[in-house]
UniProtKB/Swiss-Prot annotation:
Binding site for ATP: 367-374
InterPro entries named among the record's database cross-references: AAA+_ATPase, ATPase_AAA_core, Lon_bac, Lon_bac/euk-typ, Lon_lid, Lon_proteolytic, Lon_Prtase, Lon_prtase_N
Protein family (similarity comment): Belongs to the peptidase S16 family.
Record keyword Hydrolase present: yes
Coiled-coil stretches: none
EC numbers, comma separated: 3.4.21.53
Protein name as catalogued: Lon protease
Subunit structure: Homohexamer. Organized in a ring with a central cavity.
Amino acid sequence: MTEDFPKILPLLVEEDTFLYPFMIAPIFLQNNASIKAVAYAKNNKSLVFIACQKDKLNDNEAPYYDVGVIGSVMREANMPNGRVKLLFNGIAKGRILEPAKENEQGFLEAQISPIEYLEYDKENIQAIVEVLKEKVITLANVSSLFPPDLIKALEDNDDPNRIADLIAAALHLKKDQAYSLFANNNTEQRLLDLIDIVIEETKTQKLQKEIKSKVHQKMEQTNKEYFLKEQLKQIQKELGTDKQRDEDLNQYYQKLESIKPFLKEEAFKEIKKQIDRLSRTHADSSDSATLQNYIETMLDVPFGQYGKKALDIKHVREQLDKDHYSLKRPKERIVEYFATMQLLEMRRKKKPEKKDKTKGTILCFYGPPGVGKTSLANSIAKAIERPLVRIALGGLEDVNELRGHRRTYIGSMPGRIVQGLIEAKKMNPVMVLDEIDKVDRSVRGDPASALLEILDPEQNTAFRDHYANFSIDLSQVIFIATANNIDRIPAPLRDRMEFISVSSYTPNEKEEIAKNYLIPQELEKHALKPSEVEISHECLKLIIEKYTREAGVRDLRRQIATIMRKVALKYLEDNPHQKGRTKKGKNEKSEDQKSEDQKSENQKSENKDFCVSITPNNLKEYLERMVFEIDPIDEENKIGIVNGLAWTPVGGDVLKIEVLKIRGKGELKLTGSLGDVMKESAIIAFSVVKVLLDNETLKVPKIPSETDAEGKKKKKVLKVYNAYDLHLHVPEGATPKDGPSAGIAMASVMASILCDRATRSEVAMTGELTLSGEVLPIGGLKEKLIAAFKAGIKTALIPVKNYERDLDEIPAEVRENLNIVAVKNIAEVLEKTLL
């Protein structure tokens, strides 16, 4: 064939794949140029050249490859859609020598030259062909690319290039890969490249076969499960057991319709949507249990259920007085709060068309532990006959605990607020947010920010719980918060609450509480009668003063409970009457006879006189060790010691502030675990005392004058505060102390030591001192004065502003037994303190 080439042939472009020699293949033509080229070849009995179209084109590049196949048109036929189908017979590979050009007839023609293969070593090529055939047979075992007739054709053929063309055509290679094999005239390299391609294709086919097998197995398993489930459903229908699910769905729809008037539109739609989803979900689906749990939880929320008890402030006052002794100011504020609510209800009934926009305030009871903050909330709930829900916020650091967990999480549930409504079964319970000052922030959010919405009357009408996914009205809930230290509550949250101080009890108040509440309650708990235990007045006073150290009565209750347990033990030891064992026999008594005999025996035992009297003399038998709440004051007046008054989380305390002077250069040393504020107070006090000494407001003893070298006395007198170093100490050094209220006490003790003047031991003081010598007000006055009263202090010096503002809050018992003196400046303090 080479003798007639190169020659110019009509050019056809095949879109999809390369054609190979000795291959008869159908080709579909659509454009006019190709159809004209075929007509020309048929009329002139000419060969044609078919090249494969490129997928990607570069600039100034022909849209087809420069190699293709030379062949003849065996047959052609016109198709209904205007296309032409022809049967092409490939004869030889060819290469385009020059770019194709369009001729006068309107089709492309190009100068074509056949591709000649390089010479090769037949033995070497034969070995490579055998390896290639082996790899092809391996591929044929895992795929359908090589049918048996093609394998036979490969085995019967001896031409290595013909074998390579047959394999390449069967592999359906990508165009660039096929071009690389097609255009290569190195027979050995072609065969080696084909071996690599066949090996990679074998791996791919094996992987696809494994994947298909797994998918098929999974589909079979799925179909099997579906078939079994359908069978199970039919069996359940026959047995009637599937009716329960339908009944549950009907109950959900009925319950939803019954509460529809009380639901917001978004809430109704959300719950209904989930019920509809449940009805479409298979009972064995994992979503079914999640949906059912959500629906039942939301339908348990008491929408439209409210406590109908009309408010009665008289009943509220009676309940508070019944449950709590003293606490006059907190009780008054609570009664005022409910008086406002009662008046609003009365006015609404008279003018129902008028909607009052007044929002209730949030009460927060704050004070030391055990003074009755939570029990006040309990009394409120009893008085207005509403359920009480207590939410402990201490240590809470996950905002989802309040707002609820989103339903995307496993084990999700509504927040504590919604859970509280479900627990109360009313939409207007009394909800106690206990220990609100101990809420913490963490990476899981800031619960205090969620409380802003909950406690804001302007926002809590549409509180959105993440689990519910709709807003819930909390405006009818009475929120009451409790705290020990309001300084730890964030400022925005403090702004939403009204604070009511529940401060420490006096010893007399504790005694009355013990008599009227604690002792009767503990007697009942320990199954003892009032006639069986007598605790004397002196003994009760001793327990309060020596065995407890607290602002409230929680520890006092524990001490009384300890006494009751020991009395109960003593009762059983003194009455060793036990029920005897009986043997079954003919003369065994009936159950009624046994019951009568037991009653008779119990009466005999009860009639026996038993009474334990607890006195100061035998108290040690019932209680272990004393605590010594506040040490009594020293009766002796001393230099360099002053009684200061302090506030602690368990109430007030009397702090002895001591100071020593040591020969030195006028330095001040501070010990006793003092905080930064207290250290600054000491520095201020030292400066104020120096000024008083310089002004000769304070008289100092004479200091030996310095002499010169000749023994003559100098006229210059050394200042006393420059001659000594002061060491100020506050005992109980292991206990951290801070605050500005010890300012006047520190100044007094420094003046005492520098002037060599004793202080009055029966005087105690509290107040912040400024550099100008003024006394500023302080906090915790009630607790401090109660501590002074307990310690036997006779005179307490307090800032004048506290005297004018807070004196009414001081218990009458303390005011009557304590001389409370208001002071404006340090001069008045020193006048009352120094002898």
